[in-house]
A protein has these predicted regions:
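C-terminal non-catalytic interaction/assembly regions of soluble proteins
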Residues: 62-182
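Accessory alpha-helical/coil subdomains and C-terminal extensions
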Residues: 1-97
């Protein structure tokens, strides 16, 4: 989702800065970037992935007062925007607001496309079908088979090959400073 925020830049509304876990986050560089952009535009829009880590390899969100682990024993991600907002306010004295999209993105059915709705419905239908055939520990996957016309197929993949794995964003997609997507 954080990388996808870059798409709005093509219409002139995208974030000024984008931070993702694949690049080490440097607080001093971040504050410098925010200060520079704010001095030019009087506003700064930042998109941040919850999993960003500092130079010591620690999740930035660990600076929160409350932390817990997920079912795999990993730190439950969330709230990094608030941490950064507090730092910007404290260090730069700028007015800040943090918006966390985690719940909004899951509950905004009013902005779903017809394709989103159709594919979600068909994935659920396919999942029930394979379950009734006796399959368990599988995940329904959607693969595009054609762009024109647009077509997809539904298959199953062992859950063990998906859960608890990360597919990183290629370094070639991240600018040298690590504060945006190319």
């Amino acid at each position: 989702l954080t990388c996808a925020s870059k798409l709005s830049s093509y219409a002139g509304y995208g974030p000024d800065l984008i931070y993702i876990p694949e690049h080490t986050f440097c607080l001093n560089e971040f504050l410098e970037d925010v200060k520079n952009i704010y001095s030019k535009k009087q506003k700064v829009l930042v998109a941040v992935s919850e999993g960003i880590r500092d130079e010591d390899g620690n999740y930035l969100l660990q600076k929160r007062l409350y932390n817990q682990n997920d079912n795999f024993g990993h730190l439950q991600l969330g709230g990094v925007g608030v941490v950064l907002a507090e730092m910007v306010n404290k260090e730069l004295g700028l007015p800040v607001r943090s918006v966390e999209l985690n719940i909004l993105q899951r509950s905004a059915a009013h902005i779903l496309s017809k394709t989103d709705i159709t594919e979600a419905y068909n994935a659920g239908k396919y999942g029930i079908k394979i379950y009734l055939k006796g399959y368990t520990d599988k995940m329904v996957t959607i693969s595009r088979t054609s762009n024109s016309p647009y077509r997809v197929k539904y298959t199953i993949t062992p859950l063990a090959s998906i859960a608890n794995y990360v597919k990183p964003v290629p370094n070639s997609w991240i600018n040298e400073r690590g504060n945006n997507i190319t």
